[in-house]
Amino acid sequence: MAPKKKLQLPPPPTDEEEYWDSQAEEVLDEEEEDMMEDWESLDEEASEVEEVSDETPSPSVAFPSPAPQKSATGSSMATTSAPQAPPALPVRRPNRRWDTTGTRAGKSKQPPPLAQEQQQRQGYRSWRGHKNAIVACLQDCGGNISFARRFLLYHHGVAFPRNILHYYRHLYSPYCTGGSGSGSNSSGHTEAKATG
């Protein structure tokens, strides 16, 4: 059996209090450096927020001053950590979706004063006035309901319900055996047109 090599340990300091004090100072120096980096990053974020908020005035963000550091005393090993500054809130960007329309797009999210009345069910509404636009859009996009809703909202400014789009896709589908859908119902039988 080969003799094991002994690990060389650094010689312990002669005075333990000096050793503990030097360790506490190193920890405090590292914490102060971390705090300075955090404050610099917060200052950069604050300047970015000020640049973004040139369009609309917003209340300024006040950062609390750093708390005084506590030092370790005696031969206690416990060091107290400084309270961290609260994380900065993420900057909200305006809503820039291509399919948002209207004057409220990207503005405050407070509902208009009549929104409480509009929350109730409104009953039947005829979509017949938009029939040609719905059918043309569904045929052009291959029957994709989600795309048709976004497209019609963007180009016509009307949010069509999904069930209406499903109805027109089924009724006027070019893939039905009943033909192109003109004058036919969902069962594929042609209706007799009344003259008179």
Curated annotation (Swiss-Prot):
Keywords: Activator, Host nucleus, Host-virus interaction, Late protein, Repressor, Transcription, Transcription regulation, Viral genome packaging, Viral release from host cell. Its main location: host cell. It comes from the Viruses. Residues 1-125 are annotated as: Disordered. It holds the Pfam family Adeno_L433K_22K. Induction: Expressed at the late phase of the viral replicative cycle. Probably already expressed from the early to late transition. It is found in: Host nucleus. InterPro entries: Adeno_L4-33K/L4-22K (IPR021304). The keyword Repressor applies. GO terms for cellular component: host cell nucleus. Residues 55-64, 71-82 have a biased composition (Low complexity). GO terms for biological process: viral DNA genome packaging. Residues 14-54 have a biased composition (Acidic residues). Component of the packaging machinery which encapsidates the viral DNA into preformed capsids and transcriptional activator of the viral major late promoter (MLP). Binds, along with packaging proteins 1 and 3, to the specific packaging sequence on the left end of viral genomic DNA and plays an active role in packaging of the viral genome into preformed capsids. Specifically binds to the 5'-TTTG-3' nucleotides of the repeats making up the packaging sequence. Forms a transcription factor called DEF-A through cooperative binding with packaging protein 1. Part of a genome packaging complex composed of packaging proteins 1, 2 and 3; this complex specifically binds to the packaging sequence on the left end of viral genomic DNA and performs packaging of the viral genome. Self-assembles into higher-order structures. All late proteins expressed from the major late promoter are produced by alternative splicing and alternative polyadenylation of the same gene giving rise to non-overlapping ORFs. Expression of packaging protein 2 and splicing factor is controlled by a L4 promoter distinct from the major late promoter. Belongs to the adenoviridae splicing factor family. This is Packaging protein 2.
